[in-house]
Amino acid sequence: MRCLLLWMVVLAARAAPARSLVYRGEAVGLRADGPVAFAVHPTDATLALRGRLIFLEHQLPAGRRYNGTVELLRYHAAGDCFVMLQTTAFASCPRVANNAFRSCLHADTRPARSERRASAAVENHVLFSIARPRPIDSGLYFLRVGIYGGTAGSERRRDVFPLAAFVHSFGEPGDPEAAARTPAPSRQSRPAASGLTSSASLYDRALARSPQAPPPRPAPPRAARAGPRRPERVDETTEVEAATRAGSAFALTTPPAGPTASPAASPSRAFSAAAPAAAAQPAGDTPARFRRQLASILVPLCVLVLLLLALCAATVNCALRRRLLPCSRRVYKPRTCAACGSGTCAGRPPCRGAAPSAPATVVALGSRPKAPPLATISEE
């Protein structure tokens, strides 16, 4: 028994340590190099957490192609709200092994207007990255992923994966300049409702809602409605517009004004109430994408039409030359040789005409001289 325990301890010590962390969700899984990304200010130029989205068993979408969205959110503890940093809509993604969002035909990325240093590129195996990281960037981030099939009526599933970033500065306790330049959380996003704050966790809140604009002000009198209404501050424009332009099927609209949800209300009811409004929005139907799809259809069609016209023109030309224009046909007849009278040599040398027949030689038997007798030969 002791030998067995000692052998297990040695085997565990020699085993290679785990180098990645796998999160299993409902629609997709996430494989990250670690739960937290570290950086040192101002030494490191980029903070990045690498990983990829994968399909585990029984998670492959139905059909040959699927669509989806990837959204990068940040949680602000001071305002108890979420901020949309980037929205990416993918379309016509093939099912390549177990990799999600690989070799997609279309990818439309819309970063936030206020913060463009943070981004996510899951197609390049980068879960999120921050350019020129500062201590103020330390915090909790969420990667919200939604996948649905390309066919109508397919089920839409979403998952939220927590990520964290930690930026430390050895020379300074913090970054007061960056904190002074950061706008108030009330301008960036709206705090969650009291029901969701008390009864739901950060995971449920990030899954069920998106950053919203501050509550609208009361309507002006009728005299003021005649002129065009413009926002007083540009900062009030939220990242929800960017998510809507990107064609995200999961960007939730602002719920209508009504009684505040009770603390006993569950986040699933809030999400189910906002789901029909999100499903009514077209997924990834922007004018730029429509123009690209139209060009991808018209260009091959024009090439095929030109090839068909060229083939028809060649056929008509051949028919005219062979059928309707007999004068253009030339029949080759070899010349007759003047010497031999045949057309095989066409009068070219070494043809020298027909060979003359040799005269027959007639030999008479009686004209031959007789041989002398033997006696005469002996005397001589």
Swiss-Prot record:
Q: How does the UniProt record describe the way this protein sits in the membrane?
A: Single-pass membrane protein; Single-pass type I membrane protein
Biased-composition ranges for Low complexity? 249-269
Q: Where is this region: Disordered?
A: 172-269
Q: Which residue windows are transmembrane per the record? A: 294-314
* Segment forming the signal sequence: 1-20
Instruction: Return the Pfam families for the record.
Output: Herpes_gI
Q: Which cysteines are joined by disulfide bonds?
A: none
> Glycosylation annotated at which residues?
N67
Ranges annotated as biased composition (Pro residues): 212-221
Tell me the residue ranges located in the Virion surface compartment per UniProt: 21-293
Q: Which InterPro entries match?
A: Herpes_gI (IPR002874)
UniProt keywords (A-Z) are: Glycoprotein, Host cell junction, Host cell membrane, Host Golgi apparatus, Host membrane, Membrane, Phosphoprotein, Signal, Transmembrane, Transmembrane helix, Viral envelope protein, Virion
Q: Which GO terms describe its cellular component?
A: host cell; host cell Golgi membrane; host cell junction; membrane; viral envelope; virion membrane
Compartment annotation: Virion membrane; Host cell membrane; Host cell junction; Host Golgi apparatus membrane
So which stretches are on the Intravirion side? 315-380
Compositional bias ranges of the Polar residues kind: 185-201
Q: How does it assemble?
A: Interacts with gE.
Q: Its biological function? A: In epithelial cells, the heterodimer gE/gI is required for the cell-to-cell spread of the virus, by sorting nascent virions to cell junctions. Once the virus reaches the cell junctions, virus particles can spread to adjacent cells extremely rapidly through interactions with cellular receptors that accumulate at these junctions. Implicated in basolateral spread in polarized cells. In neuronal cells, gE/gI is essential for the anterograde spread of the infection throughout the host nervous system.
Give the family per the record: Belongs to the alphaherpesvirinae glycoprotein I family.
Please state what the protein is called: Envelope glycoprotein I
Protein's organism: Bovine herpesvirus 1.2 (strain ST) (BoHV-1)
| Gene label | gI
